[in-house]
UniProtKB/Swiss-Prot annotation:
Its EC number is 2.7.1.12. It catalyses: D-gluconate + ATP = 6-phospho-D-gluconate + ADP + H(+). Catabolite repression by gluconate. The gene is gntK. Belongs to the FGGY kinase family. This is Gluconokinase. Pathway: Carbohydrate acid metabolism; D-gluconate degradation.
Length: 513
């Protein structure tokens, strides 16, 4: 008899629910989107109840069509770094403040420079940055005392969902390790981090393993979802670490690279590790599996900007012919040889997280001459996104025990043959595209199989996930990229002061509008 499992991924723009067989075959998937409220350049919030309804409705839609396929468990993936302040009556005092919200930038800088931030990072694994709940809660406590005085708890979006489902405040080690407030070695809240934020452990949820199982879901909500209230719920982990599981990047020497709107690069190691230079994160998958890596802000958004600003006429033609606009862009880029004839693009259109951790860093072209044309700029932009990921990769290799054998590539960019080959050439490594497209949902379910005792290791993953494309590096292209990479890296280091100056100038213009 076939058994089924349901993976739910609470993302920044939508919640996805996927019903799988226990062999990993997709039975059905549903996605429900919601708004990200960005009234100004620094604010990025969501309505937590819209997200909660998306969880209920996406599950209900699947179960309405498959009432005979009750899942043996439901397991969760979630975006990281969100903060919701809750009052004494368990009602939200704030919206869901997302990872993309930069209002705590001033406090992140203060924590890093004046409050022993680097040592806190080394213990907690989360770089000191406005994305981190440590920075966000510190900002609320200091800048919004009218909220802080009423706040009983500071929680993330998955905690909000579980509070409604099970009437408990619980947070898994994975999401907690992305808050900047959990000691990675003791798996307890870090006293110094909490002191910086001005809170106590009572302000935070109870820490539990990513394999923790919850029963007795609220009967009314279970009925709305179309599931048995006794269905086991596995709390799961964060979307990033579960994506590694879902794309089969879990063995030594394997790295997962994702480029969607933003991007990330992540291997798994067996014990927590941080970086003396503060360039990378370290987040929990289980107590014996840790994901190190770096998130980048500038992935597909760079391609979208290039599409809109450099290729509007070509895109209009593509639309009329029914061709994917992004295929047109990569075809244009193919007209130019690797290295874009010496044109470099630093792709920092949205500031940058890893490896620079500088929200002020802007994008720029370098090496532009009269001989460069539009196609050079398009190719340079595509290469710039991969160059930037490669700089994060260099930091990671210092923390890895052994060479990289294979890159598992996912996200929208993995659909592009040109971009995949570019990555193989720049990284000088084999690039494989796994069959799994809903990697975080599948990763959540694989963790659920492990939590419920249906598997005793993650080795089964390779049987669930095939591959669709493979690319080996081309030496001729790799040789050109080897010459250009040091330039790309050295420029971003050399211009640090100028980045701040131009950002201050741009902010002064905004304030005059």
């Amino acid at each position: 008899m076939t058994s089924y499992m349901l993976g739910i991924d609470i993302g920044t723009t939508s919640t996805k629910a996927v019903l799988f067989s226990e062999k990993g075959d997709v039975i059905q998937k549903e996605s429900i989107g919601y708004a990200l409220y960005t009234p100004d350049i620094s604010t990025a919030e969501q309505n937590p109840d819209e997200i909660f309804q998306a969880v209920i409705q996406s599950t209900a839609k699947i179960m309405q069509q498959h009432p005979d396929k009750q899942p043996s468990f439901i397991s969760f993936s979630s975006a990281m770094h969100s903060v919701i302040a809750m009052d004494e009556n368990d009602k939200p005092l704030t919206s869901c403040i997302t990872w993309a919200d930069n209002r705590s930038e001033g406090w992140a800088h203060k924590i890093k420079e004046e409050m022993n931030g680097h040592n806190v990072y080394k213990r907690t694994g989360t770089p000191i940055h406005p994305m981190a709940p440590l920075s966000k809660i510190t900002w609320i406590v200091n800048e919004h005392p009218e909220i802080a005085v009423k706040a009983k708890k500071y929680i993330g979006i998955k905690e909000y969902i579980f509070k409604k489902l099970f009437d408990q405040y619980v947070v898994d080690y994975s999401l907690a390790s992305a808050m900047g407030m959990m000691n990675l070695k003791t798996l307890a809240w870090d006293e110094e981090a909490l002191a910086i934020a001005g809170i106590t452990p009572d302000h935070l949820s109870k820490l539990v393993p990513t394999t923790a199982i919850f029963h007795h879901c609220n009967p009314e909500l279970a009925a709305m979802m179309g599931i048995d209230p006794q269905t086991p719920f596995v709390i799961g982990a964060s979307d990033g670490v579960l994506s590694n599981l879902g794309v089969n990047a879990i063995k030594k020497g394997e790295i997962a690279v994702t480029i969607g709107t933003s991007g990330a690069i992540r291997p798994i190691i067996d014990k927590p590790q941080t970086d003396e230079k503060g360039r990378i994160f370290c987040y929990a998958l289980t107590e014996n599996h840790w994901v190190i890596g770096g998130p980048v802000n500038n992935g597909g958004i760079v391609l979208r900007w290039i599409r809109d600003e450099f290729a509007s006429s070509e895109i209009e033609t593509a639309k009329r012919l029914g061709i994917d606009p992004y295929d047109v862009l990569t075809k244009i880029a193919e007209r130019v040889r690797p290295g874009a004839d010496g044109l470099l693009f630093h792709p920092y259109l949205a500031g940058e997280r890893a490896p620079l951790w500088n929200p002020d860093v802007p994008g720029s072209f370098f090496g532009l001459t009269m001989s460069h044309k539009k196609e050079h700029m398009i190719r340079a932009a595509l290469e710039g996104v991969i160059y930037n990921l490669y700089t994060v990769f260099l930091a990671l290799t210092e923390c890895m025990d052994g060479p990289v054998a294979r890159i598992q590539a996912t996200g929208g960019f993995a659909r592009s043959d040109v971009w995949r080959q570019m990555m193989a050439d720049i990284f000088e490594s084999e690039v494989v595209v796994p069959e799994s497209y809903e990697s975080s949902c599948l990763g959540a379910c694989i963790l659920g199989l492990y939590a419920t005792g249906k598997i005793d290791s993650f080795d089964v993953v390779s049987d669930m996930i095939g591959s669709t494309h493979r690319h080996a590096p081309k030496e001729e292209s790799a040789k050109e990229y080897r010459k250009l990479m040091p330039l790309f890296i050295n420029l971003s280091r050399a211009l640090e002061n100028e980045y701040t100056q131009i950002a201050n100038y741009q902010r002064s213009l905004s304030s005059k509008k």
